[in-house]
C-alpha cells in the first residue's frame, strides 16, 4: 500500500473515531476511554505519516490558502493535545495512574470545551483537503447535485449543532454535558457525522473562496 493510501485510510479512520468519541452519551465510560487512548495512538501515526508538514511548514509558499490551513492545523493540534491531557487526567480505566493530575472539575470543564473546538477544527481541516479532491470532479449534473445536497445537509447540521448546545460547550458556559443517554449509538453517530460534515463543508467553502480570491 502506498504512503498516500495509508494517509487517506488513516484520515478516514480518525474521522470515524472522532464521531464515535463525540457519541459518548451512547457508550459507557470505559469504552470511551479505551477508544480515546486508541485514537491518541492513531493520531500519532497520522503525525508520523505527515512529518513533512512539520519540516516544511515555514518553507511552504506564504499565500492566504496555506496560511489559513496552517492556522487551522495549529489550532487542531493544540486543541487535541489539551483535550487528551484533560481527558487522561479524568481517566478511571484506561490510564488510572494519570487520574487527578489536575483538579477533576477543572479537567472536566477543559475537556468539554476543548473537545468541541477540536471537533470544529477537525471539520474545517477535512474541508480544506476536500478542496483538492473537488478539483478532480467534473462540473456535471452529479457534481451540482452533490453541491446542493451538501448545502442542505450542512444547514441541518448547523441546526443540530445549535440545538444540542455545542456553542455553550465551546464558550465554557456549562460545566456538565446535557445529553440524551437513551439515544442509540448509531443515531448519535449519524448526528455527529452530519455536524462534522457541516464544518467540513464550511472549510471547503472557505478554501474555495480563498482560492478564487487569489485567481
Identify the meaning behind each predicted range:
Residues 1-215:
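Membrane-embedded alpha-helical bundles that constitute the cytochrome b-like, heme-associated redox core
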